[in-house]
Amino acid sequence: MIFLTYNILFTFLLILASPYFLFRSLVQKTFREALPQRMGFFKTSSSEGPIWIHAASVGEVFCSIPLLKRVKKEFSQAKIVLTTMTSTGNKTAKTHLPEADQVLFVPIDHPVIVHRAIKKIQPSILLIAETELWPNLLRLVAKERIPIVLFNGRISQKSFQRYVFFKFFFKECLKYISLFLMQTEEDRTRIIEIGADPQKTRVVGNLKFDQTFPNFSQEEMEKMAKAMGLRGKEKVFIAGSTHSGEEEILISLHKELKKTEPHLVLILAPRHLERLDEVEKILRKESVSWARKTSLPPGAGGLDQKPPDVILLDTMGELMTTYSLGTLVFVGGSLVPIGGHNPLEPLFHKKCVLFGPYMLNFLEISHRLIEAGGAIQVSGKEELSSQLRRLLLDELARKELGESGYQFLQKHQGATERMFEEIKPYLSGMENVK
């Protein structure tokens, strides 16, 4: 009865949304190209019984990389189909996951569409990153006796409240999942409270600690800096994954800081690239020099060329490597009540990390990171300003903070192997797949 009600409502909403889908298909090429896949119409390039991994967006795609590489190392002949929800996640997967044999958009969660996609893919297992719960996808995959594993599972306090409110529904969805591999004990407690079978839950850690990035040589670092228009004498303040309401604060702070730090450059990376025009309006209003990264001319960063005050990072999938250029890093989504973003990424480069008061999405990690001396949390604009001023003048404090953060990161690695060992029994026979 619950699924019948859901499907009636979903069908009704899908009909209502069809004019919008048609309009977007006409005006937006990327949406037009993705729509057939979302409707379950695509050609499969994989053989029978591939591993189906679903990673909703960019963050989930990146955190899936260590596990996917480990699976391919053990089962080199296994074919992998990866689906994403967002176009940015899709592009990121195609760029950073050569191990995936096919990258598609996840089917719209209508029973007819999902059934069509399952018959096309014919997976031997479905692995879902974090907590992307599509009711019909879960129900129909399980109906085919295909095991479903939720890996790197997490439930934020905000999401938990929503799940609890609709517990009667999500409890029915969770019964189709074979195994829950959760990040923390708190995540395990929450998923059980929502309705997961305690016997099917494990705490195995967080794959985000196991992400790997290239170790850049000094020459490569200089080349990357030059592409950003940097000459080597600048201090660089990177604000990553920023949201509306934060850019005004950060640009204003940067203007103030430049009065005492004339060579300070702000690299601003909005979380959503469709907001770039909005951010540019703020920059014009603040009367600062700025440029999009992709508009910087070849050879930018020459000795006689001053870089712009603000560089807008307008490319996808480059933020984590760009962090390597930073003197100081601010993690966005935390000065406004968004819930924050992953504070671990800059730590791979031993960077000095700051974030605001709103870190609900990474509450446990942020608390433990602060306790380890690996990051600084500020209450708002004024404290952020004072901490930035202090750290810009104190190289030793920056180095100690970055080193402590890196040690914290290393201490919590190992989730990949633990998850793989839990999933491995479901992959028996994969070595024989051709």
Task: Place the predicted regions along the sequence by residue.
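Nucleotide-activated sugar donor-binding and catalytic core shared by glycosyltransferases
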Residues: 1-434
